[in-house]
Amino acid sequence: MSKKWNIDMVRNIGISAHIDSGKTTTSERILFYGGRIHAIHEVRGKDGVGATMDSMDLEREKGITIQSAATQVQWKDYTINLIDTPGHVDFTVEVERSLRVLDGAILLLCGVAGVQSQSITVDRQMKRYNVPRLAFVNKLDRQGANPYRVTDALIEKLRLNAVMIQIPIGLEDQHRGHVDLTDMKAYINQGESGENVLVEEIPADLVETAKKYRQIMIGKLADVDSAIEEKFLMEEEPTTEEIRAAIRKGTIGLKLVPVLCGSAFKNKGVQRLMDAVTYYLPSPAEKKEQALDITKNEEKFDLHPDPTKPLVALAFKLQETPFGQLTYMRVYQGKMGKGDFIVNQVNKKSVKIPRLVRMHSDKMEDIDVSYAGDIVALFGIDCASGDTFCDENIQASMQSMHVPDSVISLAIAPKDKTAANNFSKALQKFRKEDPTFRVHRDEESNETIISGMGELHLEIYVERMKREFNCEVIVGQPQVAYRETISVEAPYDYTHKKQTGGSGQYAKIVGKIQPLPPQEDGAVFKFENKVVGGRIPKEFIPAVEEGFKEQTVKGPLIGFPIVGVEVVLEDGAYHDVDSSYMAFKIAGMAALREVYASAKPTVLEPIMKLETTVPDEYQGSAVGQINQRRGSIVATTAFEGNCVIEAEVPLTEMFGYSTDLRSATKGKGEFSMEFAKYAPVPRNIQEELAKKYQAKRAAEQK
């Protein structure tokens, strides 16, 4: 590293957006203007090269970004670590992981479509991790682009205190640049790749508009900054420096979202966006980070981005490369050097860092040391994503990230012998990389089942198996992750007895099972022991809980996990000789099976939040399609010839929806969906599912 490390001159930022808002294109421009690449390649470019940040073949082909690549760019005197995050909802765990290690973010919005469902998801994730953000309204060269409307949508839909700090000079094919309201100058991009930025006086026809929006901006800044408020009340003009300081303060304090505008594809406004990153987003030293002290019962303590303090670093992403596993890390405190020993806080293993690299999409440069606030990658370290690493002087953990449950599964099997060799290797790798990708073996059908966040999520992995591991697989029908639950309280009284010469088995348990309302911590099973007077010895109580819990893995109704059950153990009996841990565990399992039917079991299915956008003339058929799929319409909004339909639809009805939507709208409709909640299925469907399951079991037992 040629430059001296100065933490105040560092920005760790991500770009998050809805799919197709132009995120990879914007990153590509940032790399170009920051001197990291020497030619610009489009995402679906004619030159067949594909964008630099999309480093997997699959990404270049589909034009979507899957793995977030980390790149370091120099901009003026600043060092910017840029994390490219996927915008497709099926990959939200990647987005969450990136946000966890960022200090600030750019929320990218399409100037035509504005705030879409995925923008809402990403915004919710940013709020969860308290990430300060700028909004960049992109694609102003497109027909129907309107940054004023998009800013209103940020305020109404996302409840953000959004304020325009730039207004466009011309829109659609007239778009030439923007007016910066902080210094009241016009910025116009020129040159083949927009590399020259001309600073001019504001065009005469825009002066009044600029003054109006500057007043709105100052009014909003007065609410978050007392110095500006004073000047505002005295009707004095604040200086450019005062305005920028107030925007910075409001942004870092999460009280304000500055809105910038431009067109990355047409090379307009990206350099000023990079300036805004350095002006308004925090350095690692300004973002408060906390860790949990393992020695003090996970008590929270503050981390300081000080290289002299003990090391705390988080592994937030893993990637397999031809040279072995690459682990992306964010250093929160202390420093990390090549050859240092670091301790994985999950398994307490001490490992030596053989190689430390700085990443540029998929090229790398070796470095010797990295300091607090930096994002780097390590080779030769075996760990899972989300593990915390420290040096010998401290035991701490960054809190574990929120990982959602999977909603869809597929049975897969290798096609032939060649595929079989790499089959488990591929699954193992994907599991390590992505906590939402799960693999298990179904004992009864003897199949390998993969589960994930949606159809596309699993499709991508099936594709990657073929491409990266030369492993063709046969894919079964997608299976929805149903759940079973109970709807009424039911008492149980069960005695387990077995006498087979020698010591037998004996356990008696009495109590009730009852529905468990949704818990704050997301728990789906609760066990309460109310046994008094030693009716069951203490050491056998956990056995009863274990028995009940084991039985919830596969419900008797349709063979899916049972959730939302509270088991109360009230009484019981034991035998001095014949009672054992095993006997009480078996009693727990059998008691649940026996009492289950009288607790009126119901089947729950995943309900998805669907957002479909279609041209107005197709609204009728789009709504009809949703109704046919047992969907309920939540809202419809119209904008400029298009209609956005928000609905809740059961996932099981969504297979093949994209094909149907395309044919009904002549390819003009698009949709995105994400998991919303679990809800009971209609009675007739429950009976059908139960019948199928019983028939399947009967066939397996023959």
From Swiss-Prot:
Residues 8-285 form the tr-type G domain. Gene3D superfamilies: 3.30.230.10, 3.30.70.240, Elongation Factor G (Translational Gtpase), domain 3, P-loop containing nucleotide triphosphate hydrolases, Translation factors. GO terms for molecular function: GTP binding; GTPase activity; translation elongation factor activity. One of its GO terms (cellular component) is cytoplasm. SMART domains: EFG_C (SM00838), EFG_IV (SM00889). The keyword Oxidoreductase does not apply. Disulfide bonds: none annotated. GTP binds at residues 17-24, 84-88, 138-141. InterPro entries: EFG_II, EFG_III, EFG_III/V, EFG_IV, EFG_V, EFG_V-like, EFTu-like_2, G_TR_CS. It is found in: Cytoplasm. SUPFAM superfamilies: EF-G C-terminal domain-like, P-loop containing nucleoside triphosphate hydrolases, Ribosomal protein S5 domain 2-like, Translation proteins. Keywords: Cytoplasm, Elongation factor, GTP-binding, Nucleotide-binding, Protein biosynthesis. HAMAP family: EF_G_EF_2_B (MF_00054_B). Catalyzes the GTP-dependent ribosomal translocation step during translation elongation. During this step, the ribosome changes from the pre-translocational (PRE) to the post-translocational (POST) state as the newly formed A-site-bound peptidyl-tRNA and P-site-bound deacylated tRNA move to the P and E sites, respectively. Catalyzes the coordinated movement of the two tRNA molecules, the mRNA and conformational changes in the ribosome. Belongs to the TRAFAC class translation factor GTPase superfamily. Classic translation factor GTPase family. EF-G/EF-2 subfamily. This is Elongation factor G 2. It comes from Bdellovibrio bacteriovorus (strain ATCC 15356 / DSM 50701 / NCIMB 9529 / HD100).
